[in-house]
Design a protein with these regions (language model features):
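Flexible "arm" and connector segments at domain edges
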Residues: 1-111
Length: 111
């Protein structure tokens, strides 16, 4: 399955497909909520002695991917475009790979 095929499958199960305003809210809030669940799993693993259930974590990451797909579509992008924009930004920011000096001294408009 390609990333854009995944996005189409995610959209098939999304609600409010004809109203983009609530969909972006649902998407971004869902990203925050699911990311919080993943963070909570890590917190319990690192600080509370829990075992890290990687299968459960993988399912949470899948939920994050679903909300990312919905969010991207709500603003008129497919996931391939989003990913390419991100790679282009990172290549411009770190042409020779990650560099802490370049990270520390990023320009103000480098988002």
């Amino acid at each position: 399955m390609t990333i854009n095929e995944y996005q189409q499958e995610a959209l098939r199960t999304a609600s409010n497909l004809n109203n983009k305003y609530p969909r972006i809210l649902n998407g971004v809030m869902g990203l925050a909520g699911e990311s919080g669940e993943a963070v909570d799993m890590l917190k319990k693993w690192i600080f509370q002695g829990h075992v890290l259930d990687t299968e459960h974590m993988a399912k949470e990451l899948g939920d994050i991917a679903w909300y990312l797909a919905i969010s991207a579509d709500a603003i008129g992008y497919d996931l391939e475009e989003i990913m390419q924009m991100n790679v282009d930004k990172l290549r411009a920011r770190y042409p020779d790979g990650f560099d802490s000096e370049r990270s520390i001294h990023r320009s103000e408009n480098d988002i």
